[in-house]
């Protein structure tokens, strides 16, 4: 079964047509049964979403939801938080992260939880941003690198926060960029168990490399990517030895099997390998497996 979702957010104004009152957010969620390729009963297109307190009136709204996980009878969706300045009609920077929570399977009791421990989006892009640990707690990635592949920024940050008993844990924050000592951006991470996780990340402090061309035929660029092993319990990181010239924005799925983490890595437009890392080892070196073949505008995006 798969979850289908959509959120709409439309600015609302008072009767005078000029006084901004907030955004009306409506969520649609459906269950797709792969066995029969039909939507199951319980589909809802009228979930009204309200932000806590005065955040809505202040211009905050959620513009996207993604990467749901299920824990203790609730779905947790990562969220892209936006803020609207009614006086200028333009977007402003935000100062918090949010998660959309709803009961499963009934799709009732929609709520938003928030934290100011980290700032940015929790919905990611294709790579999972949320992982449930052995205790049913949720590790969640927050990245303010937002436009990965854009201009390198010295303030790009990647954090892991924790959701416990349905709320953000105010005592927990893991800072990837802080431990690496350099600005970073990411789209998500993979949990290997017992607090160990692997995260592809963009090295925002390094010169950009060409990764392809845009629809207009112009070169497109990104800072090169790396891979790190995070110990989310002991607050440590190992920057793993991987090839230069990686671009992992599109990477979607890795595999953990028999204590090994598997990922396919190849520099842009070049051949590569399957890399295997021992989950229980802090060595930065992995083992090279099968060779992979790539060409212009070809990217490996997952292992299954």
PLM-predicted stretches and their roles:
Residues 29-43, 90-108, 153-169, 217-234, ...:
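Beta-propeller blade signature
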Residues 1-43:
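Post-signal peptide N-terminal segment of secreted/secretory-pathway proteins
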Residues 1-4, 42-61, 105-127, 166-187, ...:
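Surface-exposed loop and turn segments in beta-propeller and other repeat-based domains
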Residues 168-270:
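Intrinsically disordered, low-complexity segments enriched in Gly and acidic/Ser/Thr residues
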Residues 265-269, 280-304:
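Blade-level signature of beta-propeller repeat domains, shared across WD40, Kelch, NHL, RCC1
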Residues 58-209:
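Acidic, serine/threonine- and glycine-rich low-complexity intrinsically disordered segments
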Residues 17-18, 24-30, 82-87, 145-149, ...:
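Short glycine/acidic-enriched loop and turn motifs that connect beta-strands
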Residues 1-16, 70, 130-135, 254-256:
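Eukaryotic scaffold repeat domains enriched in small/polar residues
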